[in-house]
Amino acid sequence: MANDLESALSIAASGMRAQGFRLKVVAQNIANASSTTDRTGGEPYRRQIVNFANVLDRELGAKLVEIKNVKEDSSQFKLVYDPNHPAANDKGFVEMPNVNALVEMMDMREAQRSYEANLNMIESSKRLMSRTIGLLR
């Protein structure tokens, strides 16, 4: 049973690490949602997307969550008419980041809920360990 609890703790901890990283990336996306380049022809900030992977921990016999990579979102930039901006093209349009605040808020909420679920799993595992130790006394 101790190995099962140890596996549960490791799985939940890896999930918490992954979701914590995801929250950092979402925060970075939100922080850069209005940033532009300072010159014509330069690209503005591109939304970052976190991809996860399952990794087998042979010692525990459990699949853990790890960050596979962080990729740039290849969707189109938004165009905003601002002919006085230094990065405006010859038609007066400025490319803005491809960050949608609503999508980022939803992504943040999902990561937060996943983080909380993993935290609850750790707390449940700790309670089970305490009860098991109590029974052995």
Regions found by a protein language model. Give the residues of each.
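Amphipathic alpha-helical polymerization modules
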Residues: 1-137
